[in-house]
């Protein structure tokens, strides 16, 4: 079920922010947000952070409690939620703008993480028409 606020006000989810004590992660987070539509493999993230894939995975787990792939998927889901809340883009267009590659992949991750589909999520943010 999508988040809800009384009065028809959409509830916006802030983007995750890296811990100030992790400058390497802050820099990587900024880079990833500029490249969300790219193919962001763990190898590519490791190269960007100038570390091995193993070091990246270990540091990620220590700092965020999750894997790099789950982290990127979370960023993409957050962007998809924002677009669904604030635009009339089709699910296909939202998937493309978020880097999912296909609407099928977006729906898969949406259902897995939010137990709903993109259209049902969007419907939770429509303001009911009066009269």
Regions found by a protein language model. Give the residues of each.
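Generic C-terminus detector
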Residues: 107-108, 113, 120-129
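Key DNA-contact positions within bacterial/archaeal DNA-binding proteins
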Residues: 54, 103-104, 119
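HhH-family (HhH-GPD) DNA N-glycosylase catalytic core used in base-excision repair
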Residues: 13-18
């Amino acid at each position: 079920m999508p988040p809800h606020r009384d009065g028809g006000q959409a509830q916006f989810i802030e983007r995750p922010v890296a811990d100030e004590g992790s400058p390497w992660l802050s820099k990587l987070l900024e880079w990833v947000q500029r490249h969300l539509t790219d193919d962001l493999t763990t190898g590519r993230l490791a190269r960007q952070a100038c570390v091995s894939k193993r070091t990246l995975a270990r540091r990620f787990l220590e700092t965020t409690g999750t894997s790099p792939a789950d982290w990127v998927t979370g960023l993409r889901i957050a962007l998809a939620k924002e677009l669904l809340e604030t635009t009339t883009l089709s699910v296909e267009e939202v998937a493309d703008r978020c880097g999912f590659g296909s609407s099928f992949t977006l729906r898969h991750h949406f259902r897995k993480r939010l137990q709903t589909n993109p259209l049902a999520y969007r419907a939770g943010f429509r303001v009911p028409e009066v009269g």
